[in-house]
């Protein structure tokens, strides 16, 4: 699996940041690439994303919810991925660290995705955190 990491500082305590990140359905408002998120119950969600000129659908399950320190998920269908937000208090507020791992099954698609995905994920991650920060 390929791994992407992104870090940012938000000027708010971890409790406030975590409260926004754990509202998974609201990620639709945090990124232009997320078309919709369907709650499936029991910590599971179906994501519909348009990225790299393709539509992607995958189901994820929240695998760890430890307020206000960590929120993690893993895909259960569709694009294989897992990720985690780690929140750490710092003098300026909260350091938010995203680690995202993914695997694309098609070699042709994987090559195109690898070229575009790292800057794309970093941009989307920053967009998400900027929009979360605006709600704090």
Question: Residue locations for each model-derived region?
Answer:
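Short, surface-exposed coil-to-beta transition loops
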Residues: 3-5, 55-59, 80-84, 95
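A short, structured loop/turn motif at beta-sheet edges
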Residues: 14, 42, 63-68, 86-95
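Hydrophobic pocket/interface hotspot
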Residues: 17-21, 27, 45, 62, ...
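Short, intrinsically disordered, mixed-charge
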Residues: 19-29, 118, 122, 126, ...
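Glycine-rich portal/gate segments that line the openings of hydrophobic small-molecule binding cavities
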Residues: 38-79, 127-135
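Beta-strand/loop substructures that line and gate deep hydrophobic ligand-binding cavities in soluble
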Residues: 75-126
């Amino acid at each position: 699996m390929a791994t992407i990491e992104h870090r940012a500082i938000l000027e708010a305590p971890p409790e406030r940041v975590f409260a926004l990140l754990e509202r998974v359905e609201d990620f639709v408002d945090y990124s232009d690439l997320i078309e919709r998120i369907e709650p499936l119950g029991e910590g599971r969600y179906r994501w519909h994303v348009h990225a790299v000129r393709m539509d992607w659908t995958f189901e994820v399950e929240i695998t760890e919810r430890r307020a206000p320190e960590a929120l993690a998920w893993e895909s259960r269908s569709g694009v294989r991925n897992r990720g985690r937000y780690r929140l750490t208090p710092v003098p300026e507020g909260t350091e938010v660290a995203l680690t995202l791992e993914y695997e694309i099954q098609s070699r042709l698609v994987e090559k195109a995705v690898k070229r575009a995905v790292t800057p794309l994920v970093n941009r989307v991650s920053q967009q998400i955190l900027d929009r979360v920060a605006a709600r704090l």
